[in-house]
Amino acid sequence: MYGTNLLETMGKPTAGHLGMAVTFTILVAFTIHVLRMRFFHPLRRYPGPWLNSITQIPAAWALLRARQPKAYRELHEKYGPIVRVAPNELSFINVEAWDDIYGFLKSTPNFEKSPVFIGAVSPLNGQTGISLANNEEHTRQRRALAAPFTNRALLQQQDILRVHVDKLITALRAKARNKESVNMGEWYTYTTFDIIGDICFAEPFGCLDGGESNEWARAIINIFKAATWDQAIRRVAGTGTLLHKALVKIIIPAEAAQWRTIHFSNSKAKTLARLADPDRQHPDLIKHILDSEDSRAALSPTEIILNMVLFISAGSETTANTMTGWTYFMLRHPEARARATAEVRAAFASPRDIKWETVRALPYLNATLEEALRLFSPAPSNQPRVVPACGAVVAGCPLPSGTTVSVAPWAAVFSARNFADPERFAPERWLDEGGADPRYAADRRGASQPFSTGPRGCMGKNLAYFELRLVLAHLLWHFDLEPTDSAAGRECMRRWEQTDMDTYQTWMKPDLWVDLKEAQR
């Protein structure tokens, strides 16, 4: 009787009661989560913003805003060389962290890529290209793809590069004679897209011939944007979850699917056509695969296609960005420009003398390139890895299994812990022996890894260096460079000076207007 009266007094639960109960439950769960992340998590002792320690939202927001390199640089400047950037994630700028995270490890398995990472190439039919493959699959594919990237292969590809460099110089000469300012960023993009198409499957994009980009080239640049947005979504929603799929549809533009379709379908068609023409004597990547029985046996047709999709995207805009960044630094530093120009013109009596084996021997030109790669890395964003099941030590810090770790490349090269006067463009810091500058003797050069390092380091590093040296040496041999003295030209220089640009895995470079004059001899 008493119980019945009590129930009647209390009444039946209402929507308000249920709402209060749900709210209370959420608050309790959130409080427990915060307490666990702040006081009981294995990473609790590492410094970082309070919000980052309890949620992935700040890290995801940095990606969505296309500002991760800048955001992480600010965090490291405030909190030090090791920062907790997410509840279970650390970012490092220590030199030794490069090898500890990305290097060839002996006592532990190599770190796997984080499932958060997604590049320009998605899996297909359960297969992946080398970029997203697990360690075992990565080793198999890398071994099968290694032959086209050796120095011997580069020498065979030298004539391919020369054709496109000659086209670039011819186009620039016409601009110079007409006294037209040149947007070098665009022309470098035309050049690198044509080169990588010819190198991959003997089919240049035709950008240099038309003096403009095409739909395929534009799609590749946009794919980097979609991949970065997807990484941000994965941070808060997980990988492959219903929430992940829903947020992808909401956040990523519908045309992103078209970007991937254009890139994939074109790459697939070109790859299959090249595979069907094994007798063609052209030293492209697929020709090397066709000529190697081991490579043909190790790679499925789908894997070959996926890797060509990757090489086209990874070997085009990133290289153009480096060329444009180098040109900006040359324009900003006339003393360095004059010294590099004098070195190139003294070394070569004719442009035909500019070759792989000769251009790599120019110490000052190469020093300017290394310094440009330091200050304007083609890959400035963190590349997350996961600590293996046995745990690992990174930069002297014992870390448990499952911890996500990475190096912040842009923060590392701008840290005074690694480089003296880090914001200064100083090619002298890369000179050895007689040309070395004692001010930079203590620089930790290993902090600059523009092509990453270890088993997943960039396969195209040698090709990129060759392409960069060849194009830049030809530019200095043929032309005198000056910044364009116009309102648009000055605004572009301001944006470069402040690194006022978005980052979607690589930099979205601003225009760079240059006045060219033919060299007088």
UniProtKB/Swiss-Prot annotation:
It is a single-pass membrane protein. Its main location: membrane. It is found in: Membrane. Heme binds at C458. Its EC number is 1.-.-.-. Keywords: Glycoprotein, Heme, Iron, Membrane, Metal-binding, Monooxygenase, Oxidoreductase, Transmembrane, Transmembrane helix, Virulence. PROSITE patterns: CYTOCHROME_P450. It is an enzyme of class 1 (oxidoreductase). Induction: Expression is induced in spores. The chain crosses the membrane at residues 15-35. GO terms for molecular function: heme binding; iron ion binding; monooxygenase activity; oxidoreductase activity, acting on paired donors, with incorporation or reduction of molecular oxygen. Gene3D superfamilies: Cytochrome P450 (1.10.630.10). GO terms for biological process: abscisic acid biosynthetic process. GO terms for cellular component: membrane. It holds the Pfam family p450. Glycans are attached at N366. Its cofactor is heme. Pathway: Hormone biosynthesis. Belongs to the cytochrome P450 family. Cytochrome P450 monooxygenase involved in the biosynthesis of abscisic acid (ABA), a phytohormone that acts antagonistically toward salicylic acid (SA), jasmonic acid (JA) and ethylene (ETH) signaling, to impede plant defense responses. During pathogen-host interaction, ABA plays a dual role in disease severity by increasing plant susceptibility and accelerating pathogenesis in the fungus itself. This is Cytochrome P450 monooxygenase ABA2. It comes from Pyricularia oryzae (strain 70-15 / ATCC MYA-4617 / FGSC 8958).
